[in-house]
Amino acid sequence: MSASTETHHASEAAVPTAPRPRPGLGTKNGRLHQVPHIAGLILGVFSVLVFLWSISPVLRYYVHVPREYVDTYYFDAPDTSLSWALVVALLAAALASRKRIAWWLLTIYLVLFLITNVIVSITDKNVNAMAAAVVQVVLIGILIAARPEFYTRVRRGAGWKALGVLIVGLAIGTLLGWGLVELFPGTLPQNERFLWALNRVTALAAADNEQFTGRPHGFVNTLLGLFGAIALLAAVITLFRAQRSHNALTGNDESALRGLLLQYGADDSLGYFATRRDKAVVFAPSGKAAITYRVELGVCLASGDPIGDPEAWPHAIEEWQALASQYGWATAVMGASETGATAYNKAGLTVLQLGDEAILRTREFNLSGRDMRQVRQAVTRVRRQGVTVRIRRHRDVPAEEMAETIRLADAWRDTETERGFSMALGRLGDRLDGDCLLVEAVAEDGEIDGILSLVPWGPTGVSLDLMRRKPTSPNGVVELMVSELATTSDQFGITKVSLNFAVFRSVFEEGSRIGAGPILRIWRSILVFFSRWWQLEALYRSNVKYQPEWVPRFLCFEDNRELLRVGFASAVAEGFVTLPRFGRSGTRDALEHTGTHAAVPAALVAAEGLHSDGSAPGEGLAPTATGPKRPEQVRVRLDKLAGLAEQGIDPYPVAYPPSHTVTEAVESPEGTTVRIAGRLLRIRDYGGVVFAVVRDWSGDIQILVDEARVGTDRIRAFAAEFDLGDLVEVAGVIGYSRRGALSLLANEWRMTGKCLHPLPDKWKGLSDPETRVRQRYVDLAINSDARRLLEARSAVVKSLRDSLGGRGFLEVETPILQQVHGGANAAPFLTHINAYNLDLYLRIAPELYLKRLCVAGMEKVFEIGRVFRNEGVDFKHNPEFTILEAYEAHSDYEKMMVLCRELIQTAAIAAYGREIIMRPGPDGALVEVDISGEWPVKTMHQAVAEKLGVDVSPETPLTELQRLCDEHEIPYQSTWDAGAVAQEMYEHLVEDYTEFPTFYTNFPTSMSPLTRPHPTIPGVAAKWDLVAWGVELGTAYSELTDPVDQRNRLTEQSMLAAGGDEEAMELDEDFLQALEHAMPPTGGLGMGVDRVVMLITGGSIRETLAFPLAKPRQ
């Protein structure tokens, strides 16, 4: 995308004056507010009538009487005058646009007519004149009352210019008309021909036809009226045309914009183009947001989103609309993002998708693959010709080389003027643009074959500003530069590149597809036709080859009736249409600051943070964020932190290990000297003595600071220096208080960490569950129960590991990133590796890799590790959790049952010293449950039958199972087989209501794709599930080792996955190939470690995790 250097001046600057009226305000009286529109409508209808009877003799005949009445008493209504029809029409449009000069003209005109009617009514006793005078008094009164509603300005000096245009135009028209009358006089006498031409062209047909003794040919009257209409049209347009913004950026304006971009520009790919210096700018009153714009054809055209703080966008938009309303400009926006378009839409603008911006994500960009074949071939072809790419920041390019780059960019431009407005900077080589990137294609002989210049897009992106290639350079130079930029972008910290904006991208893409409708094809054909001049399709084709991400961009405008004018104004601004300019030069300089009136709020200028040369504000002087708003207690602690620093006290010192833990200190004999460290939980100051409570992970101890031991100054310093929550080190001797409480009698202390936030209520702690999860560190610091749960978890995990190790199992680690998700029926998380441009899954189970190790000969192997399943979150589910999987050769699922029970019982001993678990009792308090000995074992179908009170077995027909489901309101899908329906019944009737740990065995084969069929019972698999208190704790199989059967089952699973079942497994060819090398008969065990901890401790899954997943902050 190239930048536009050609813009246009206006005669006068559009400089707002305070106070500015807001759109739609004025008197704020609803009826008076509509006066401009009503006046415009009435005069508009009248102008149409004048036009119609001027060209139609029949209509003129029928309206002769009312026309003469209106013409005599109310408003000039000549019988034939196209020029008058045009004048009234322009006056109507100006009134509807609230132009103040139109109000003056209409009011003065009515006043003059009123004076005439008053004189006639007095001298001639004319009742009609008197009635008309009364009506005109009322109309004039309404106009005077509604004067504040006519606030739109026209250009300064427009009246004198319009008068000059009118005089010259009428003189030329009269002379041409006189010549025509002389050529075609008709019955008009010689002495009346000049007057006839003068009357018809300049006198607005004030003299009626009856005052002349003859007539010229009919077509002459039409031409004479046309001459007058042209002159009046030019004059009235000169008079009524809207003020055109002549102002542009000043140095302070650009400096403020750069400050806003530094703070808020990371998400706006077009933001840097706001510094284009031939644009004007309007700021929010706070200076925290701004809109850059240009005025073309009476349209105030903003470019892209507002710059700055999104919270201040509405205020900037309001100021922009007020400015446009003041000068009668229609408002429109080119290239707004979805966020920006939403803000403009809330301000009353209509939004229309204009096209899409092409975004390259450089970490995902790769030349491999079928879709990139065209780019890859072009790059290879150019590289073979010895072309290389050089990429530098503008600030690193020597001045003479930059001058040559500018010369080449001008020489290789294929149009007279540079195109671009919303996505073009309009300058090269400016010292303030040092962060811009220059990409050059360099031929073997050192000549430059192509140039790209890209502007910053936040700290990690760039946006294409200028693209040039040497006419004789080989095809593919641009592809080489873009691909090299994308593949080497990490050297410049670039992760995203914004390429050209493709107008109507979806039309080109969808209109060329098979099956596109006729309307879409016609629309595409029209765009292709205009692409001969405006390169619409070429921009799309040049971008789509890179497989970019398409981000929609929008056109915003006030009124559908203005859409054509807005579109034409946009074409003018972007350089697609060049209009002739008269008077002053039509160009505005995009290289220098030509603005004469700074738009930046005076408060920002007064802060002396802005630079008149346009550079970004200095550090600390720009309107930068001050961080989060701090509560008062935090501010007090921050002040105390600063005070400590001023006193030379380091609130975060280097380590000095304590001599004892708190528990060790408490157990030490009286008089023992100790040094402990922990968090200060309580302070009680009694003047001469201060009591405090310090806690480390092992326990709490009371600290006693006695004035008699340390002195008055030091005891005061202790009370003043520390706050609750601070980390402290205290040294002293173990002793007792006067009331006999064991205490550490402090001699020395120091702060090891200043806590900047107050602790929660010392009795209630963190009562909100979400806060407890989000601030887990606080909960653990003050909540002993939470600490005991984590201790129990650690004991359980260590016990599981030690128990398996003691049985001869080897612990291994298998990949977490996997190319195929398998080993369980669950929805996976998807991620992407940039190095190989490959989609990967976070594992849902380690099973298939552990079985590969079984094939390799590891007879006893286990893993304890994290797995990830994209499922719901509740008291027993977390998206990531810890699993234990163990495999033993020459074993089966029955031996795994014994192993599982013993592992859990041993873990309970590690946590509590006995084979007990904790469960909530009726009152919510935890009670002990003995889990020693054997646990119940039932088949799945037997458990379902007991709940239903009817016989259910693996042979029960599907229709009977469906009938039972309907009877007990158990949902199922019509496509499920009998095994799936039976398992659904088990989950609803059995699993949810099981309490004491129970093994359920022999599940349907169709629901166990990795399990060996039961050796004696057809239709079921050698599998069990362990359930306790409604939670599935683990499962075990006699593993399926037949590779042919396993391939068939996984193929069925992959077909389900292809059909949309996201929980079905994919076909893992590598695993099947390993299985084909033979795996011994194996028993496999899988157990949820988090759920085992839940079972033993009686907590929820969130309580047993150090950091469970928390909801996003609102």
Curated annotation (Swiss-Prot):
UniProt keyword Ubl conjugation present: no
Compositional bias ranges of the Basic and acidic residues kind: 1-11
Region described as Phosphatidylglycerol lysyltransferase: 1-618
Keyword check for Secreted: no
Transmembrane segment boundaries: 38-58, 77-97, 101-121, 126-146, 164-184, 219-239
DNA-binding region per UniProt: 674-751
GO molecular function terms noted in the UniProt entry: ATP binding; DNA binding; lysine-tRNA ligase activity; magnesium ion binding; phosphatidylglycerol lysyltransferase activity; tRNA binding
Protein family according to the UniProt entry: In the N-terminal section; belongs to the LPG synthetase family. In the C-terminal section; belongs to the class-II aminoacyl-tRNA synthetase family.
Protein name as annotated: Lysylphosphatidylglycerol biosynthesis bifunctional protein LysX
Organism: Rhodococcus jostii (strain RHA1)
